Amino acid sequence: MLFRSPKELKNVLKVFKEKKGASASLALSKSYKGSYFTIDRYMQMFGSNPFTWVNDGSGKLVASETTDNTKKALTYLRALYSEGLLAPDFASSDPSIVESNIKQGKTGVIFGPWWQYEYPLADLLPTQDWLSFPIPLEEGAKIVLPRQQIQYYYVVLKTCAYPEALMKMINLYIELDGKEGARAEDGYVWSWVPTQFYDPYDIDTQYTTINEQLKIDPKAENEAPAEWSAHAKKLWKAYPNYLKWKEDHGAVKFEANTFANIIGRVNEDGAWAAIKQTKAKDQFTYNEFYGLPTESQNLYGGQMSTHCEKFFTKVILKEANLESDWDNFVSEWNSSGGKECSEEINAWYAERK
């Protein structure tokens, strides 16, 4: 493995700077959550994930951004900036600027989701070799994941005579236009209806199924099994050409969509395989709050978010003293709505024990 800890990662970043001339060795934007290249992805090395709620060991939920793990993460990121391993203009680096740095060869390491090979790396793969590794964790740290991934809510008026009709309609969408119905003969349908059905096991099923078939037919010389999805069949059909390209990048034309999919989703040294390693080692824990935003979160969430982002940025840029200012940061977080949010979320949590 290239790096197994934050310390080893730092050494790799130094190599990119010293031997490759990387001016932004790590792909880090000023945004701290909610997009590509955000600060929260890198804080995961220390078991921190802002705006999640974790059990403190006593049965109480605490905001991750106020924990010692966040303090450790900020200390590390500040050191990277001090040593020139982040972009010198980090304070103004939004995700689009970070993406530009990646495409200009100024960056060597990206933390991201398993589909990162498809964006933004797909255009770079013909001339650059990018490798996948699990997130390097501080000893004892665990990645914080959402227990429930909820993107949207549907609401029904109290005066509605038949509120159950909403669930019946959603079930109908999934039954007729969902997992199976959306698999067209020559491709697949991303979204036919406002309610999308995401099969959380689909990526792992595809990974396992294709790799089992490759044990029988390692060069994909035969047709894919008839019961496979259209997308899996598409990757299988492209696999022989992918092997030629892998052996010699000039042998065949790079097929951006399918080859990037194979590298990230199928290869046993790819991105999904790296995630499977993290799961197998039980190196994750959960965000324990998955309810509707509380009243205080709706009232104060914006100012709490701004408070965190400003402080994180100042710390990384060494404009704030982490040791002397940390307690004040937590105190201001509480006074800006955090105390009320914590009380409401712990009341919600207590009802579910």
Regions from the PLM with identified roles:
Residues 1, 31-83, 115-148, 212, ...:
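Extracytoplasmic/periplasmic substrate-binding proteins
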Residues 1-3, 60-64, 290-298, 312-319:
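Second-shell loop/turn segments in exported
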Residues 1-37, 55-106, 154-189, 320, ...:
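Helix-loop-helix "hinge/cap" segment bordering the ligand-binding cleft or interdomain interface
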Residues 63-73, 295-311, 343-347:
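Short, 15-30-residue, compositionally biased linear elements
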Residues 75, 127-135, 144-221:
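Polar, glycine-rich mid-to-C-terminal structural blocks
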Residues 103-115:
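Alpha-to-beta junction loops
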Residues 178-313:
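Conserved small-residue motifs centered on glycine
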Residues 310-353:
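Histidine-centered catalytic/metal-binding microenvironments
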